[in-house]
Amino acid sequence: MKARLGPIALLAGLLSTPAVAQDPQLSQFYASPMYLNPALTGNTYQDRLQLNYRLQWAGIPPGFETYAVGWDHRAAQVNSGVGVMVMHDRAGSNGLSFTQASAAYSYEARIDRKRAMRGGLRLGYTQRSFDPDNFLFADQVIRDNASTSLESGLIERVSYFDVSAGGLYFTEAFWAGFSVNHLNRPDQSLQSDGEARLPMRTSVHLGHRIPLDGLSVGRSRTELTLAAHYKAQGKWDQLDVGGYLHLEQVSFGLWYRGLPGIKAYAPGYPNDDAVILMAGFETDRQWTFIYSYDITVSWLARSSGGAHELSVRYEWPRRTKNRKAKIVPCPKF
């Protein structure tokens, strides 16, 4: 019966404690720009296709998996970006999952030739579901592990619309942005007589690109990028801080995630999550492949197995030297 206690706790938390619900997180957060901030939609010279995969807690089979695919386009003639994205997240082997399809739009306003601001909006349609056959309910335990539950009032599938927005200020070398997700606080409850409003997720991110070969930003092929990303949802918050080094077509990154000494989840459980190692390879400025591994440093370190993450990006070649596309915001892994 011990093997089934995890599903009991997971379902109990899902149904009765909505404040702890968290969105999927990506260590390579800039590798999924529309998910990070809709203002980053179309932050490329042309079209872009992005694929993301994350396996979290691989040491607790089958782990938690997140898949995402996105496409966006920069319409420089109207100072805009448009894109679409699909994300699927599965929690363990218990059939608890969510799938979201969304569309994003961004608009760019130039301050001068070297500075600009962008605003973005993302509208999504989400479906959350679970398979009750994979859970053990309290009434089954009471009835000597009965094969079926008498539990009533559960909804196996719930759907809702979701609204996110964000803003960005940027130059060729510096950027600072914010985003707010779930502005409409949709109800994600899986109980027919309950309510579980999804907490808003806020994000603040900034960074700086430093050329190391004497060339200007944008022309340099050897540069250091330093960045930080703070995110909060309900009672949960974390800070990612680190950087990555570009050496021609190869990149290496090192990050830390947590808020040690500043905040604890509970007495004896500090907000100390992971050290992230990252490596990537770029081919002729079109294909980019990035792999990262989260080394868990929290109390789960011995059993979690860390997290593996892979991102693949393809950017269509730049067709014209459009003056409106002189600067492109945000770094690229």
Each language-model region and where it sits:
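Bacterial N-terminal signal peptides that target proteins for export
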Residues: 1-8
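Subset of outer-membrane beta-barrel
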Residues: 22-333
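Bacterial N-terminal signal peptides
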Residues: 8-16
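Sec/Tat signal peptide C-region and signal peptidase I cleavage site
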Residues: 17-21
